[in-house]
Amino acid sequence: MSRTGTTVEIRDLIYLSEEGAPPRRLDVHRPAADRPVGPSVLLWHGIGPDEKDVLAPLAREIASHGLPVLVPDWRSDAPDGGRSHLMASLRYVRDHAVEFGGDGGRVVLAGWSAGAGAAMGLALRPGATEGVRVIAAVGVAGRYDLPARSTGTAPLADLDSTEAGAGAGAGAVPVTLVHGAADSVLSSSHSRDFGAALRTKGWPVTSLEPASDHAGVIMTEYDPARGLCVPSTSEHVLRAGRETAAAIVSAARTV
């Protein structure tokens, strides 16, 4: 899968303003060169509040393949667990993606760690996307037996719901699951188990286990002094992150 060249970054666009609260912001990573309008990628970070910067290396890599990527801050410590932030960012992509060369009517929803569960929650409950058309969902290093921040219910439990059952089969949102084989934060068994459950219900699933850990699959490494993931220059980490990016790009282009 070839890259298209350099990328452009637009930082700290406001996607949600709430009275009495700081504005919620997002970053856009897009190809520098003009291209035909294609799918847009909405990429959600994990449980750490307002950590969009953590996903910048992965977002740049995806954008280098020709897709606009929008990465919002959101707060898991909000009273609703972050749901209003996540949903507002989804609506923002629908309404504004065209400004960055993307199609707001074709959204690839991807998330890492807690963001993965949030993405899968909406993939299984298309009626909860507020009219936004999600064409593919990608979960990276996620856990799916806990309530998703986007829906309040566990994706694994949602598989038995009437809505998920109606969405399975030919019309199902294709799912891609990426999980580092050496992940010691969230075992890759979570993705394997979820993938198996999806397949049992007739869901189209692609699974990938790069030789990496929880941070490496997004081109980062954990810095204990700072308490967060930071960009890595290690070749094996970059290789794993490129696999993740390629999986997201493939999900966008095979729909």
Predicted region positions:
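Conserved alpha/beta-hydrolase
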Residues: S64-P79
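Primarily recognizes the serine-hydrolase "nucleophile elbow" in alpha/beta-hydrolase
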Residues: R91-D158
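Short beta-strand/loop motif that positions the catalytic acidic residue
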Residues: G171, L177-H179, D183
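Conserved alpha/beta-hydrolase "acid-adjacent" motif
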Residues: S184-D193
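C-terminal catalytic histidine-bearing segment of alpha/beta-hydrolase fold enzymes
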Residues: K201-V255
